[in-house]
């Protein structure tokens, strides 16, 4: 990860993952750690080409005594990035509250959603990376998970109507993110609790760090497994929907042997996404998807 080439490759990869729309406002959750600092900088790097705006959203939970340092590095990043891109910083202070991780996460997402609503953003990007994915899948395995747990962290999910969470760094190693921060002189804060192995995720992280030298492709392998599990989970309901559609078309048309899989699959995807309109089924036959009144 030396020199300009790895930096440029990372910028191109993240820009492709983000796929910023022209004029879009993207909220980036920035805790102040190296991963989210890098994501904020990478998003700002991609923004001008799409005439997009980036909002660096920082949530101060009021739990950690040195939380002011996290906020300071986020504000400093926003100031630096605003010189070359349309970037602003939004800070929310929630504390003091419960140190329970689930409650902190819920409060953080609620604050991020509020910022998205205020700024007109439809997407919130978080800095979950490849090692986060590995830890999540392994924790799920230790709990005796099924296919849902094996799917790990989703690259995208709906947080609320009209607002989606996106994770453009899920295939990126955090060492590359730290190298990016160093190459561009972006300061970041470190959370001392990340080395407390009394916490389950930290214990799993320490375990994985011990075996990575023997399994150098570990994170890529787990990422592939998670992707396969997600595909299988999503494919099953769609397969059932395709079967129902073929049965219904058979009832209506009498014969469906000349209706291609691709036509039925496209119709199934349209129904899943709630897209209305006409869909070609076969010569002289169209299926019309309409919005049903409640």
Which functions belong to the PLM regions below?
Residues 1-140, 175-176:
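ATP-dependent adenylation/nucleotidyltransferase module used to activate substrates
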Residues 2-35, 47, 52-55, 61, ...:
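AMP-forming adenylation/ATP pyrophosphatase catalytic core
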Residues 49, 53, 84, 110, ...:
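Generic macromolecular interface patches on structured domains
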Residues 63-68, 195-198, 275:
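Acidic, metal-coordinating catalytic cores used for nucleic-acid/nucleotide bond scission
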Residues 69, 180, 203-204, 279-282:
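Surface-exposed beta-strand edges and their flanking turn/coil or helix-capping segments
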Residues 98-103, 200-202, 289-291:
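Short, solvent-exposed polar/charged micro-motifs at secondary-structure junctions
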Residues 105, 170, 197, 279-280:
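Residues that recognize and position ribonucleotide moieties
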Residues 123, 129-272:
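Flexible helical/loop "lid" subdomain adjacent to adenine-nucleotide binding pockets
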């Amino acid at each position: 990860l030396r020199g300009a080439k790895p930096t440029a490759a990372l910028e191109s990869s993240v820009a492709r993952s983000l796929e910023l729309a022209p004029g879009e406002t993207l909220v980036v959750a920035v805790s102040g750690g190296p991963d989210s600092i890098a994501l904020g900088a990478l998003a700002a790097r991609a923004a001008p080409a799409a005439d997009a705006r980036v909002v660096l959203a920082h949530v101060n939970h009021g739990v950690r005594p040195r939380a002011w340092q996290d906020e300071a590095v986020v504000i400093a990043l926003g100031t630096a990035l605003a010189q070359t891109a349309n970037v602003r910083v939004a800070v929310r202070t929630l504390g003091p509250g419960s140190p329970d991780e689930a409650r902190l996460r819920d409060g953080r997402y609620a604050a991020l959603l509020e910022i998205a609503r205020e700024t007109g953003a439809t997407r919130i990007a978080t800095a979950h990376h490849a090692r986060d994915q590995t830890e999540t899948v392994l924790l799920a395995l230790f709990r005796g998970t099924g296919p849902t747990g094996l799917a790990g962290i989703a690259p995208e999910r709906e947080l609320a109507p009209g607002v989606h969470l996106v994770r453009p760094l899920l295939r990126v190693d955090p060492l590359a993110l730290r190298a990016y921060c160093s190459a561009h002189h972006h300061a970041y804060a470190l959370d001392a609790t990340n080395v407390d192995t009394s916490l389950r995720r930290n214990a799993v992280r320490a375990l994985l760090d011990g075996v990575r030298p023997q399994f150098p492709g570990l994170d890529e392998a787990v990422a592939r497994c998670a992707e396969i599990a997600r595909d299988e989970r999503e494919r099953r309901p769609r397969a059932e929907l395709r079967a129902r559609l073929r049965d219904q078309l058979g009832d209506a048309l009498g014969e469906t042997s000349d209706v291609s899989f691709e036509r039925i699959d496209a119709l199934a995807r349209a129904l899943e996404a709630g897209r209305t309109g006409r869909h070609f089924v076969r010569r002289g036959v169209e299926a019309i998807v309409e919005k049903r009144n409640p």
